[in-house]
Regions:
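Structural boundary micro-motifs
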Residues: 1-110
Length: 110
């Protein structure tokens, strides 16, 4: 069985992407069922968002500007999970970092 806790890592930054509010609510319910708190608060009591960080302590939290920069721009040491695909049992739930083909060579997640 797939769990959120399986991604707790001491070496990588772990981010879960939510495509919509319903996906985020499902994530919060699953996290709470696994005993994961949102910095001491039950996740289902928090506002939904598009990206959630899983901390090495096993807690989850919102992502600020620095975390968003890391999510979008860091190539190594970052795990990005599409929670919608993960929760549906899809095998391709990891979001890969790819360099854009644009002229400015800015990174692009696909």
């Amino acid at each position: 069985m797939r769990t959120i806790k399986q991604f707790i890592s001491k070496t990588n930054k772990v981010y879960f992407f939510m495509k919509d509010e319903a996906t985020c609510r499902r994530f919060y319910q699953a996290a709470e069922a696994e005993g994961i708190s949102f910095c001491g608060t039950p996740p289902t009591q928090k506002e939904t968002t598009d990206i959630i960080a899983l901390l090495p302590s096993g807690e989850i939290c919102y992502v600020g500007w620095a975390g968003r920069m890391c999510y979008h721009n860091c190539k190594k040491g970052v795990v990005r999970i599409d929670y919608g695909k993960f929760s549906e049992g899809c095998g391709n739930y990891l979001i890969k970092w790819k360099k854009s083909n644009l002229s400015n060579n800015s990174p692009k997640l696909q």
